[in-house]
Regions:
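Subset of outer-membrane beta-barrel
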Residues: 23-457
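Bacterial Sec-dependent N-terminal signal peptides
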Residues: 1-27
């Protein structure tokens, strides 16, 4: 997709026009569009993609293929659910500060929202296994989650060329909405091999408005073109992980795990087709309070269509010394080039991504030194964006750091407060540059009393 929406002086104006709380046109009751952000590129596709990684993985470069943990969820690779050792309720929040600029100007903006809600649990309670002295050679996990997947928010104004008869014109473009995903995830593990699936229900609504007005004629009627469309439908995700555990000779001559292992992982989505329903409306109104005129020119509702979501895959390799050290790298690709949407046709590009991450725990079993039990994380992410400006694809490069702070709940089950900070650059150099700092805060509240089989003697 190629577009020339961002000439330098206009780009500066559009950045200042919306901020985080853009207001509606005060003289028109037709629309109530209040974007939560002002991102020009969110006009295309289904909006700005929102990271689906939880706070723990966000601090490690957004690793997803190989990350598995006994007390954290990794729903991007559902196979990791089979490694859970406790029921985990997770909630995540994020805030982002962006400095946007072109060759001649800059602006600052804040945004933030809920990142995810999720509940996951093992299918075999580890306490029962221990009390019954059963081998944990197989297990499973299940989870339910809700998260936004895209966000649309823009409020900008483009000045048209001066017309000899009508004078200069203005086009005010505004949009809001986004897409969400509710997922049911499940996984099974036998020895070192885990496999899982995500069943995703995608839904959402997006509203786009364009108001054309004549700047030099205050009495001239303005024309608004309003488009709304919703999406709904299912697609599938998948994941596999294999952990090769290193062993050593035990006291009785048998082989026992050393706690060190290599993890190979693959995950992704199968794409899929979802339903769309669009409504189109064009109308005229008076932009001033002197003359009140409202006239609907055309309206059409219930326009059924389809949208093809892209498929993706990620391959990863990691080394772990359990409860001590983790390092991983991965490569992924998403086929946005096959994306289609009858309600809002756009041309997107395939994207690739690379991520590197590390986690270090000084002493997970330390009794009286809190900071030795903290999980310290760092990472790097390099990835494309499916949208392009003037034929050049946008890109994001970022470094991440994070910590996982262990906390004890009344049941003495360990839980975590996870914080990740990402510093990066996004956009196309000298056309649309964004330097940002993003904070992700996550709570992982764990309890192993679910499915606990109590016995009476």
């Amino acid at each position: 997709m190629s577009t020339k929406l961002f000439p330098s002086p206009l780009f500066f104006f559009l950045l200042l026009a919306g901020g985080l709380g853009a207001q509606t046109v005060s003289t028109s009751d037709f629309v109530d569009i209040r974007p939560k952000q002002n991102s020009p590129l969110s006009r295309f596709g289904l909006g700005d993609p929102i990271d689906q990684v939880h706070a723990a993985a966000a601090g490690m470069g957004a690793l997803q293929a190989t990350y598995q943990d006994a007390y954290h969820l990794n729903l991007l690779n559902p196979a990791s659910l089979a490694s859970l050792q406790a029921t985990s309720f997770e909630i995540g929040l994020y805030a982002r500060n962006s400095q946007l600029s072109d060759a001649n100007s800059s602006a600052n903006a804040w945004q933030g929202n809920i990142r995810y809600l999720a509940l996951g649990f093992p299918l075999r309670n580890p306490v029962n296994l221990s009390l019954d002295r059963l081998l944990n050679s197989w297990n499973g996990g299940m989870a339910f989650s809700l998260a936004p997947t895209t966000l649309v928010g823009y409020d900008l104004e483009l000045k048209g060329n001066t017309d000899s008869e009508l004078g200069p014109t203005s086009n005010r473009l505004r949009g809001t909405g986004g897409a969400y995903r509710f997922s049911w995830s499940t996984a099974l593990r036998y020895r070192g091999l885990s496999g899982g699936v995500n069943v995703n229900y995608n839904f959402g609504k997006i509203t786009n408005s364009r108001i054309l007005s004549f700047d030099s004629i205050p009495e001239a009627l303005a024309t608004e073109f309003l488009e709304e469309f919703s999406i709904s439908g299912f697609n599938l995700g998948y994941g596999l992980q294999y952990a090769f555990n290193f062993t050593e000779a035990g006291d009785e001559g048998n082989r026992v795990p050393t706690g060190k292992r290599i993890i190979v992982g693959v995950n992704g989505t199968l794409g899929g087709t979802v339903d769309t329903e669009a409504s189109l409306l064009s109308r005229r109104f008076s932009p001033s309070d002197q003359v009140i005129v409202r006239d609907t020119l055309a309206a059409e509702e219930g326009i059924a269509g389809l949208a093809d979501l892209p498929g993706s895959y990620t391959l990863g390799l990691a080394y772990e010394d359990v409860n001590r050290f983790f390092i991983g790298a991965e490569y992924g690709r998403t086929g946005y080039g096959s994306y289609t949407n009858d309600a809002q046709p756009d041309e997107l590009l395939d994207v690739t991504r690379m991520a590197f991450g590390v986690q270090y725990i000084p002493n997970a079993n330390s009794y009286n030194r809190f900071w030795e039990r903290v999980r310290y994380r760092a990472g790097l992410r390099l990835e494309d964006d499916p949208r392009a400006i003037d034929g050049e694809q946008a890109r994001r490069n970022a470094v991440t750091v994070g910590v996982g702070l262990p906390i004890r709940l009344p049941r003495q089950q360990i839980s975590f407060l996870d914080l990740a900070v990402e510093y990066g650059k996004f956009g196309v150099p000298e056309v649309l540059d964004e330097t940002y700092v993003q904070f992700t805060l996550g709570f992982s509240l764990n309890d192993n009393s679910w499915f606990f089989k109590r016995k009476l003697n």
